[in-house]
Amino acid sequence: MATLACRVQFLDDTDPFNSTNFPEPSRPPLFTFREDLALGTQLAGVHRLLQAPHKLDDCTLQLSHNGAYLDLEATLAEQRDELEGFQDDAGRGKKHSIILRTQLSVRVHACIEKLYNSSGRDLRRALFSLKQIFQDDKDLVHEFVVAEGLTCLIKVGAEADQNYQNYILRALGQIMLYVDGMNGVINRNETIQWLYTLIGSKFRLVVKTALKLLLVFVEYSESNAPLLIQAVTAVDTKRGVKPWSNIMEILEEKDGVDTELLVYAMTLVNKTLSGLPDQDTFYDVVDCLEELGIAAVSQRHLNKKGTDLDLVEQLNIYEVALRHEDGDETTEPPPSGCRDRRRASVCSSGGGEHRGLDRRRSRRHSVQSIKSTLSAPTSPCSQSAPSFKPNQVRDLREKYSNFGNNSYHSSRPSSGSSVPTTPTSSVSPPQEARLERSSPSGLLTSSFRQHQESLAAERERRRQEREERLQRIEREERNKFRYKYLEQLAAEEHEKELRSRSVSRGRADLSLDLTSPAAPACLAPLSHSPSSSDSQEALTVSASSPGTPHHPQASAGDPEPESEAEPEAEAGAGQVADEAGQDIASAHEGAETEVEQALEQEPEERASLSEKERQNEGVNERDNCSASSVSSSSSTLEREEKEDKLSRDRTTGLWPAGVQDAGVNGQCGDILTNKRFMLDMLYAHNRKSPDDEEKGDGEAGRTQQEAEAVASLATRISTLQANSQTQDESVRRVDVGCLDNRGSVKAFAEKFNSGDLGRGSISPDAEPNDKVPETAPVQPKTESDYIWDQLMANPRELRIQDMDFTDLGEEDDIDVLDVDLGHREAPGPPPPPPPTFLGLPPPPPPPLLDSIPPPPVPGNLLVPPPPVFNAPQGLGWSQVPRGQPTFTKKKKTIRLFWNEVRPFDWPCKNNRRCREFLWSKLEPIKVDTSRLEHLFESKSKELSVSKKTAADGKRQEIIVLDSKRSNAINIGLTVLPPPRTIKIAILNFDEYALNKEGIEKILTMIPTDEEKQKIQEAQLANPEIPLGSAEQFLLTLSSISELSARLHLWAFKMDYETTEKEVAEPLLDLKEGIDQLENNKTLGFILSTLLAIGNFLNGTNAKAFELSYLEKVPEVKDTVHKQSLLHHVCTMVVENFPDSSDLYSEIGAITRSAKVDFDQLQDNLCQMERRCKASWDHLKAIAKHEMKPVLKQRMSEFLKDCAERIIILKIVHRRIINRFHSFLLFMGHPPYAIREVNINKFCRIISEFALEYRTTRERVLQQKQKRANHRERNKTRGKMITDSGKFSGSSPAPPSQPQGLSYAEDAAEHENMKAVLKTSSPSVEDATPALGVRTRSRASRGSTSSWTMGTDDSPNVTDDAADEIMDRIVKSATQVPSQRVVPRERKRSRANRKSLRRTLKSGLTPEEARALGLVGTSELQL
C-alpha cells in the first residue's frame, strides 16, 4: 500500500477579495496520503488536521510548486505527472506542500456574486482588486469566463460611472492577456459591443483604454476583424446611426484635440481592414467610413502642419490600401519609419453629444467632392444639442482671457484675430485655437519649436520620476492587499468624492462667467469627469491671484491628476504615453491613493509632492500652449448644460455616484437583455436595510442608502424602469386610499401582490379586520421577490402548453365584490330631523331608488316596521319588489323549501358578465295548475324531506417505522440503479437513469454529517475491510457536492410539468364551465320551469331561487304517483322545448371541476412559486461547484420559463376566480353570500343535478317512444290483409316505408359513413424542399504579425509585466507598419466593384444612376 507523506497547508481564500497569498500555518504539519484512494475521500482528514475555515464541500487541493489543482475524483497514483518535481527542495531547505483552498468555481461564483450585489465603496474595492486577483491565480480566468463573468462585468459597467469603468477595463485587459480570456471575449460578442460603445464615452481615459483593448483584440487574430465589424454594426444599428460613427467622432475631434486617440482610432480601422478576407466586407466598411466623411478628415490632418507622424502614417496606410483595392497600382507604400514618441494633449474625447462647425464643414466639403446625399450621419443627440456659433466662440475666448487664464492668454495671437472666415478652417474652438497656433502668422516659429524641445527633457525627467513613484505606490498597495486596507482606501476615496463635490459646488460661483449667456450657471457635474475636472481646476487655479496660497483641497476635484497630467506633459514633445497597464492600473491606483493622502494631510511629503505636481501641470499648460483645459471645458459646455438640466429634473436619489454618461450607459445596458434575469436570480442577494448600513458617510451616503433600500437588484435590471417607478410613486399613492404606508414602495408592492390595492374602501364589517395587517410592520422583501415582481410586470401571453387563457382580459382583474361593495357601503345614520311645528312627527324618509314608499307612520309611532331580510343581505342596495301570486289554488299543496332570491338593483352595470340577470331573461312558463294541484296535494301528514348525512368515518392510517436505517437503505437499493450510476445521473440530471420515484427515495437516504464522519473514520481505521452496501452507498452520496440542492432541483424539474397540468387544467375547466352554463339554453328551460312550478306550489311570485336547491329536486315527490319533481320538470321541458338537450353532455367542464378542490389548487400554486424560488437558490449553490455550462444554461432557462409560467398561472387563477364571482352574481346569488360559496360544491351540485336530469330525461323519452311505437302498432292491429294491398278492390297506393325513430338514426348513420368515406381518401401534399444556398468560406490565413506573449509563471508577477505586454502589442500595432507593404488580394464577388469614393468621383452612367435611385438628385447635377 503506497503512501505519500507531505506537508499540508491551507490558504484562506473563502473571500476572494479578502485573501492572502501566504499559506497557513507557517510550520505545516505532515499528512500521509494513500495513493490508491481517491483524494476526495481523504480530504476530510486534511481539513480536520488543519482546522481550516473552509466548508468541506468547497475545498480542493493545489500543489505549491506548480500551482496545479489535483482531481479529487482520482487517486494520487493516477496523477503522477502533476507530482513531478514535487519532492524537490523549494529552496533554503524547505519542502513543497499540498495546499487546501477553495475550489475555483466557488471563488469565481463568490467574485461574481460580490460584483453583482455590491455598490458604492464595496463595489469600488471589488473592482479595484479584480485585476490583482486574476494575476495571482491564472486558472481563475478560465473559470471566470465560463461562469459568465464577462457578462457580469458588462452589466456592472453599464450602470457605473467612468471610475468604475476604468477598473473594469483594467481587469478586462488582464483577462485578454490570457488565451482563455481572449477566447472567451471572442465567443461573447457582447464584450466587443460594450468596448465599442465605450469609445463614445466623454471620458478620455475610458475611450483610450477601450481603444487599446480593441486594438489588442483585432491584432490577436485576423478572424477577429469580422467579429469587430459585427459588434460595430449591432451597436450603431441599435442607436440608429451609421456604423463606425463612434470612430469618426474621434477622428473629427468633436471634443478637442488628442493626437493619441486619433492614432489609436485610425490604427484600429487599418487593422480591421487588413484582416478582412473578402472584398465585399472591405468595401462595406470603407463605404461607411467614406459616407461619414473620412476623406475630408484625412485631408485636413494631412494638410495641417505639425500633425503627428504616427497619425500621418496611419492615414497614409488607409489611403494606400483603398487605392490598391480600387486597382491603382501606382501608389507608393507608406513610410516605414515611425517616431518613438507622439504628441498628446488632454481633452474630453468625442461622445457624439453635439455637432459644431466642424461637422457642417465636412458636409460642405463632401458636396464639393460629389458626396452630398450619402454622408449625413447623425447621432441621436445631434438635433437637440446646440452648436457653437462664431460669436459664442469670441465671447468665450474673451471671457477666458478676462478671467485670468494665463495659459490660454499666452497662447493667443497678439493680432487678436477672431474666427477665420474661410470655409476650410471652420472648426470647433479647440481646433481653432490649435490652427491659430499652427497658422503661418508666426506662432510656430523655429524659436518656439526650440523652446518646446528644450522643455522636453525636463518633462521626460518628471515623467520618469512619476513612474517610479507610482510603481513604488503600487508595490506598497500589493503588499497591503488586505481587506482592512482596501476598506480604508475605499473610505478615503468616498470622502474625497464628497469633498470634491463640495469644492466643485464652491467653485461653480467662480466659474459662472465661463458659460454662454443662455447656459445654466452650475458647473458642478464637471467635477465628476476626469478631463472636465482637470479643466475646471485649471480655470479656477489660474483665476486666483498668484500670491494666494492654494489649499491642498484645490485638487480634490481631480480623481486622477497624475494619469491625466501625464499626457498633458507629453503633448509638445510627441512622447509615447504610458500604455494600457501603467496608464490604466498603476497611474490610476497610485494617483487616487496619493490624492487621498494629500487630502488627509498625513505625510507632508505627499502634500508637497502634490503641490509640486499641480504647479508642474500649470507649467505644462503654459509650455504646451494647447489650452487643453479650456478646450475641454468649452467643448463640453453645452453637454454639461444638458446633463445639469437632466439631473435637476430627476428628483430621485438613484444616482448618488455622480453624473453618469447616460447615453453610453444606456447603450451598454441594451447589450445584455437575454441573460439579465438569469444573472439576477443566480447571484441575487438580500440587501441590508438602511439601519444596518454604516452611517458616517454624510448626506450623500444616507441618500444612497435610502435609494438602495428602494432600488434593489430588480430595479437594476432596467434602470429606466426604476426611474419611472419612483417618479410615478406619487401618482400611484392617489389610487391607494386606504394604505397607511404611503411613502414606502415596498408597502405598495406588498399591497399590490396581496390583491388589496384595487379594493378601495371596504364594507364596515370588514374594515377592522383589514386595518390590522396594515399597521403591522411589513416584512422586508427579498431580492427574489423584487425580481419576481419585475417579471410579473411584463408577463407573457396567457397560454399554458396547449391551454388558451387569452380571453381572460383586464376586466377580470377586478373583483365585482370588492369594487361594487366598496362603492355602495351602507350609509351612516342620518342626521336627526329638524324640529317640526306643533311637535308632529317628521315625514318618512324618501324611498330607496325604485322601492315602494313605506306607509305613513300612524299616529305618533315613530318605530318603522321591521325589514323583511336582515341587514347583511341588502347592503344598501334596493330590492326589486316581489309581485302578487299569479295562481289561485283550491287545495293545499306541498311546499318547496327553497331559498328565494330577490334580485337587487346593484350598480355593476359596467361589468359585462353581471350586467344582466339570468332570471330576468327567462321566459315565463305556462303550467297545468290543475294537474299540479292534483299531483302535489298536501295530505294530512306531510312527507318530510329525507336528508342524506354522510358519516365522516376516520380513515385509519398504517404507520410503518423503520427499525434500522441500514435495512431501509438496503431495501431502497433494490429498486435503484447501482450507486456509481446514481452519482453520475445526479451530477448530469440524467432522467433516463433515475426517475421521479427514485429521486424521492434518495431524498430519504441523504446522509447526515455525523453518518458521513463515522463512515470515513471507519474506512480510514480499517482500510482493508470493505464497507457494507448501505455504508458504501451513503459514502458515494456524500461525495456529491450540494446533494440535497441537486435532488430538490431535479425533483422540481421532474414534478413541474405534472404539477402545472394539475393546476392549469382545472382552471381551464372552470373557465369553460362558466361559459357553458352562461350560454346553455337547456339550463334556462329547466330553471324557468322549476321556478313556475315552485311559485304555484308555494303560492308566491318569486323572481329567483338559489341554485343549491337543485340538490333537493330529485327528492321531492308527488303524493299521487310518487314520482319525483325532477320527473315532472323533465316532462314539461321535453314537451315545451323539444330541441333541448340532456344538459349533462353539454357541461363536461363543470363535471370535471366538481372533482377538484380549488382551495388545495391555490395552495399548490403557492407551493409551486415557493419551490421555483427555492430552485434558484439550489441552482446558485450547485453553480458554485463543478457544473457544465450547458447544463447550467439549460437549468437557468428552465427555471426562468417556470417563473414566467407560474406568474401566468397566478394571473389566470385570480382572473378566473373574479369571473366566477361575477358569474354567481349573474346566476342570482346574493352578494353577501358569494364569498362563502365553495366552487367544488357548486359545480358538484350542478353536475349531479345534470346527471339526474339526463337519467330522468332518457326514461321520459323511452316512455314517449314506447307510446309512439304503441300508436304505430295500433294502426295495424286487427286489420286484415284484404283491407289493403292487391287484395283490396281499389288500386293500392305504393307502400310507404315506415320511417320511425330508428329509421332517422339509420339515415343519419348512413350519411355520416358517406362523409367519412369522402374525407378519408389520402391527400397528397406537395412539399417543395427549400433550396439550399451554397456558401463558400475562405480559409483563414495565419496572422503575419508575430504574436509572442512572454508570461511569468512566478507568483510575484507584477503589473509591469502585464503592462509591458499590453504596451508592446499596442506599440507594434500603432508604430510598426504591416509586413505586407502591398495590401492583400481579396476575393471579389464582382470584378468591377470599386469603392464609393472612386465610384462617385469617376461618375455614373445613366443606367447605374437609375439602378441606385439617384435620378434627378444633386449628384448627377454636380
From Swiss-Prot:
It holds the Pfam family FH2. Residues 367-390, 438-449, 536-547 have a biased composition (Polar residues). Residues 450-464, 604-624, 637-651 have a biased composition (Basic and acidic residues). Changing G653C: In CMH28; uncertain significance. The keyword Coiled coil applies. Residues 410-430, 521-535, 626-635 have a biased composition (Low complexity). GO terms for biological process: cardiac myofibril assembly; cortical actin cytoskeleton organization; sarcomere organization. Residues 559-569, 592-603 have a biased composition (Acidic residues). It is found in: Cytoplasm, Cytoskeleton. Changing R469S: In CMH28; uncertain significance. The modification Phosphothreonine is found at T775. Residues 448-480 form a coiled coil. Residues 827-849 have a biased composition (Pro residues). GO terms for cellular component: cytoplasm; cytoskeleton; Z disc. The DAD domain regulates activation via by an autoinhibitory interaction with the GBD/FH3 domain. This autoinhibition is released upon competitive binding of an activated GTPase. The release of DAD allows the FH2 domain to then nucleate and elongate nonbranched actin filaments. Belongs to the formin homology family. Actin-organizing protein that may cause stress fiber formation together with cell elongation. Isoform 4 may play a role in actin filament polymerization in cardiomyocytes. PANTHER family: FH1_FH2 DOMAIN-CONTAINING PROTEIN 3, FORMIN HOMOLOGY 2 DOMAIN CONTAINING, ISOFORM I. It is linked to Cardiomyopathy, familial hypertrophic, 28: A form of hypertrophic cardiomyopathy, a heart disorder characterized by ventricular hypertrophy, which is usually asymmetric and often involves the interventricular septum. The symptoms include dyspnea, syncope, collapse, palpitations, and chest pain. They can be readily provoked by exercise. The disorder has inter- and intrafamilial variability ranging from benign to malignant forms with high risk of cardiac failure and sudden cardiac death. CMH28 is an autosomal dominant form with incomplete penetrance. This is FH1/FH2 domain-containing protein 3. It comes from Homo sapiens.
